[in-house]
Swiss-Prot record:
It is found in: Cell membrane; Endosome; Nucleus; Endoplasmic reticulum. SUPFAM superfamilies: Protein kinase-like (PK-like). One of its GO terms (molecular function) is protein serine kinase activity. MAPKKK serine/threonine-protein kinase involved in the regulation of a MAP kinase cascade (probably including MPK3 and MPK6) that negatively regulates salicylic acid- (SA-) dependent defense responses, abscisic acid (ABA) signaling, and ethylene-induced senescence. Also modulates stress response (e.g. drought) signaling and cell death, in an ORE9-dependent manner. Functions at a point of cross talk between ethylene, ABA and SA signaling that impinges on senescence and cell death. Residues 53-68, 367-378, 404-413 have a biased composition (Low complexity). This is Serine/threonine-protein kinase EDR1. The active site is at D792.
Length: 933
């Protein structure tokens, strides 16, 4: 820069330099010029110009000069100083528009919290509006302390290129370029916007009518005001977007502008509604944050408001579907949300930083900056709606529910003695009400040991009914503390926390071998119908004192023992029965204790006797026959059981189950039309050597290294499963770019389409049979080795064949789905069927599938869509954080209602297993109570 200034000073003015050399001014005059000019330049520029002046003065001649020469020098020096000031001004203006410096300044403002209010006061209102508008354009956030001022405008880019470049047009450019096709904007201008002025007056009246403690009521009234002004509520935001597109075109044609005052927008999309709500909230001093981006809304161009209640918790405000509904924001803490600005050329939404290691507060401690984990725990400790005699919790509609502070937990004695229904209230006594959908809050006490209506209590003989705590078994031989992790549990009255879990192991996987081995010896040997699971007793077993006996015939009086840990108090009983059973089973085998050959003979004989039920050549495998038969699995040697880790890493096992045996060349498949789009790929109808098949091709073909090995490992697992209620796996294409799995083709399609098509009338007994099919298919997955957790069980993944048999599909690929619902910044996913722990991204086991089955049973019983009228974001908040459940209709059979509620237990360990569900569903003969005549 110094050389440029010298060039400006010397270039084209050689005569001035000559005159300066001939006759320089006195040194005192030189000093006057130097001291007079620094206010026009920066300190750095002054230091740079001083040597030049010094050099000029040193070159001056001590001889006196004429007045004309002195005047020429003064004019040339003044010209130089003007040029210097212009250069410095241009340099400063360029640096102020530097995007990097602007980002650094914005980051400093955001991190300080106060946003330098003193500097903002010095700026004019136009400068503040321009700064806030640019901040919202680039970073997508206006914080609680930032008020929307007049001349603030929100620009919507219709051109993706401009958005990527971070080019934000000024308000003057938008107003001068009439009808600019690349942008449209809404502006806040109270003096000229009469509609906005009226809305502000209404908001002031609403605030005066609400007490200072009724913040949720104020939020609801403001949300209803915004929604009513901008076209009303809508279940589908795409419909509102289409209406706005049409309306904006009319505005542009009539007004010849692309800038619309916010008050004149009568059909508003989410960004318009959120901005108007922010303006109204600022006017009534309601803390409100305006956030734009896909983190909350699923769309980069949508916006949402978050409000902070007096307990320092943040909630999202619904302004589209159900105005005024508050949904807890998925921040780890209200105070630990560090908003960092992102690159303006990339994602414009600031990233929220979480900490997964937030220390959990003990009871008695409190903080306004508590973590979401503590918030979830407080929800779990909250008193839920009390249970009535009909076992249905009848809770009033949820609307203004306050989740700010947990109330004391009601004892189980009070819950039992109270036969009336308590209407749920918030901490401030507001009655819970809702105008759209009635949801039930699952009472934690409904399955307590003292509850006589516990449907599954008799199925668990190892439950200590008289104790406050259940026996917690320990695993012998597992001494490495680092390999354990504590499962997150809800503190419940009268219940102990869940047992420790082995990493990468399902909850019932490790002790399953020993427990089922004991149970098999405790109960008589059962011949099971391989299709329907019917049991017939081959012989009865009794103890020496006659305490235990069993005689099971068909479906009647079936007692099924859940696979729970065996207390040490039963060790003597186990040893008591084992010798007699072993002797009876091996009386023809020369007293050899080899159980598996005998079991194989029994199965072989059963297959020969019952081959008319279904084709065993299709559903059985000679090389691996333990995939779904619990008898074979229970009698396996303990040393032969493999967990998921050892199964993947043992080379010998991998060689025995080579993927090459089920490899299908891509060229052998004749691909036809596409019949579906799943959560991980496209589904095609294809032909494979004359056989109709379904080909599921992955959308993400970038599989290499560990991911490809994981895919092949899942193929081995699916290859082993043979069950009439599991989609038959034929093979796989294991070579990119055509990674696919090939299964049987089921022409009737998904159960979802059958249940929810118009005028669908399915016989009630057929629907019961469908529920039983799903339970038996899932029991096959959960009892396999290793245990297969579906994690995406829903009616769209249940397929129906020509004989109306329901089969479980899309299993075994949960680990290949890289994004869960919360980790993915899109609305992809189906939270309507997901368990609360899955929606919260907490560790989950196979019991999450049991919750999903409860939703499926609810669908089969009611023939209604789950959570109809709510968008996915609302379902996540309702189920995952507010502990809400679907309403159980009064016309449902009480047994069916209790089964569904048992599946929806908040604590996964309290949910029944699919083995228990199968036994309970078998004698079921109705879903709905008969209509009184």
């Amino acid at each position: 820069m110094k050389h440029i200034f010298k060039k400006l000073h010397r270039g084209g003015n050689q005569e001035q330099q000559n005159r300066t050399n001939d006759a320089a001014p006195p040194s005192d005059q030189n000093r006057i010029h130097v001291s007079a000019n620094p206010p026009q330049a920066t300190p750095s520029s002054v230091t740079e110009t001083l040597p030049v002046a010094g050099a000029t003065s040193s070159m001056a001649s001590p001889a006196p000069t004429a007045a004309s020469n002195r005047a020429d020098y003064m004019s040339s020096e003044e010209e130089y100083q003007v040029q210097l000031a212009l250069a410095i001004s241009a340099s400063n203006s360029q640096s102020s528009e530097d995007p990097e410096k602007h980002q650094i300044r914005a980051a400093t403002l955001l991190s300080l919290g106060s946003h330098q209010r003193m500097d903002s006061r010095r700026d004019s209102s136009e400068v503040v509006a321009q700064r806030l508008s640019r901040q919202y354009w680039e970073y997508g956030v206006l914080d609680y302390e930032e008020k929307v001022v007049d001349s603030f405008y929100d620009v919507y880019s219709l051109s993706t290129d401009s958005a990527k470049q971070g080019e934000m047009p000024s308000l003057e450019d938008l107003e001068s370029n009439h009808g600019t096709p690349g942008f449209e904007a809404v502006v806040v201008n109270r003096p000229i916007d009469s509609s906005l002025h009226e809305l502000l007056e209404i908001a002031e009246c609403i605030a005066l009518g609400c007490s200072t403690t009724s913040v949720s009521v104020l939020v609801q009234r403001l949300a209803e005001l915004v929604t009513e002004h901008m076209g009303g509520s809508a279940e589908d935001s795409s419909i509102v977007l289409a209406r706005w597109t049409e309306k904006s075109s009319e505005f542009k044609a009539a007004l010849n502008t692309c800038v619309f005052p916010i008050g004149f927008v009568k059909i508003g999309i989410s960004r318009h509604r959120a901005l108007l709500f922010k303006v109204l909230a600022d006017s009534v001093r309601l803390p409100c944050r305006l956030v734009k981006g896909s983190h909350y809304t699923g769309n980069e161009d949508d916006a949402v408001n978050t409000i902070r209640l007096e307990d320092e918790r943040e909630y999202l405000v619904d302004l589209m579907t159900d105005p005024g509904t508050l949904i807890p924001a998925d921040f780890a803490s209200a105070s630990n949300n560090t908003v960092e600005p992102c690159n303006s050329n990339g994602n414009k939404f600031p990233t929220a930083q979480f900490s997964n290691d937030v220390p959990k507060l003990s009871e008695g401690e409190g903080s306004s900056h508590s973590s979401m984990a503590n918030y979830s725990s407080s929800l779990d400790r909250r008193t839920e709606a009390e249970r009535t005699d009909s076992s249905y919790p009848k809770v009033g509609p949820l609307r203004n529910i306050d989740y700010s502070s947990p109330s004391s937990v009601t004892s189980s004695t009070q819950l039992e003695n109270n036969s009336s229904t308590a209407i749920g209230k918030g901490s401030r006594g507001a009655i819970i009400e809702c105008s759209r959908t009635n949801m039930n809050i699952v009472p934690y006490n409904q399955n307590s040991e003292e509850d006589p209506k516990n449907l599954f209590a008799d199925l668990n003989p190892f439950q200590n009914k008289g104790a406050d705590k259940l026996y917690m078994p320990t695993k012998s031989g597992l001494n490495n503390v680092d390999d354990f992790h504590q499962q997150k549990n809800n503190p419940l009255v009268g219940r102990s926390p869940a047992p420790m879990m082995w990493k990468n192991y399902s909850c019932n996987e490790a002790p399953k071998r020993k427990e089922n081995s004991y149970i098999e010896n405790l109960l008589p040997k059962l011949h099971r119908d391989p299709r329907y699971g019917n049991t017939q007793s081959s012989y009865a077993t009794s103890s020496s004192n006659g305490a235990i006996s069993s005689n099971v015939h068909g479906r009647d009086n079936v007692t099924f023992v859940s696979p729970v840990a065996v207390p040490s108090s039963f060790t003597s009983t186990e040893n008591q029965f084992r010798p007699s059973i072993v002797e009876d089973m091996n009386r023809n085998t020369n007293n050899e204790l080899d159980l598996q050959p005998h079991t194989a003979a029994v199965v072989h004989g059963q297959q020969n006797d019952e081959s008319h039920i279904h084709d065993h050549r299709k559903y059985t495998s000679d090389d691996i026959s333990t995939g779904c038969d619990p008898r074979l699995k229970d009698h396996e040697s303990t040393s032969s059981s493999l967990d998921s880790t050892s199964y993947r890493n043992d080379p010998q096992v991998l060689d025995d189950a080579d993927v090459g045996e089920c490899e299908i060349p891509w060229n052998d498949l004749v691909i036809a039309e596409r019949i579906g789009l799943g959560s991980y790929g496209e589904v095609y109808h294809a032909d494979w050597h004359g056989t109709e098949v379904a080909v599921k091709k992955f959308l993400d073909q970038d599989f290499s290294g560990a991911a490809l090995a994981e895919f092949r490992s899942e193929v081995r697992i699916m290859r082993r499963l043979r069950h009439p209620n599991v989609v038959f796996f034929l093979g796989a294409v294991t070579r990119p770019p055509n990674l696919s799995i090939v299964t049987e083709f089921l022409p009737r399609g998904s159960l979802y389409r059958i249940l929810h098509r118009p005028k669908s009338h399915i016989d009630e007994r057929r629907r019961i049979k469908m529920a039983l099919d799903v339970a038996m298919g899932m029991n096959c997955l959960h009892t396999s080795t290793p245990t297969i957790v579906h994690r995406d069980l829903k009616t769209p993944n249940l397929l129906v064949d020509n004989n109306w048999n329901v089969k479980v599909g899309d299993f075994g690929l949960s680990r290949l789905k890289h994004n869960t619902f919360l980790s993915s910044k899109s609305t992809a996913g189906t939270p309507e069927w997901m368990a609360p722990e899955v929606l919260r991204n907490e560790p989950s086991n196979e019991k999450c599938d049991v919750y999903s089955f409860g939703v499926i049973l609810w669908e089969l019983a009611t023939l209604r869509l789950p959570w109809r009228g709510m968008n996915p974001m609302q379902v996540v908040g309702a189920v995952g954080f507010q502990n809400r459940r679907l309403e159980i209709p009064k016309e449902l059979d009480p047994v069916v209602g209790r089964i569904i509620l048992e599946c929806w237990q908040t604590d996964p360990n309290l949910r029944p297993s699919f083995a228990q569900l199968t036994e309970v569903l078998k004698p079921l003969n109705r879903l709905v109570l008969p209509t009184p005549q």
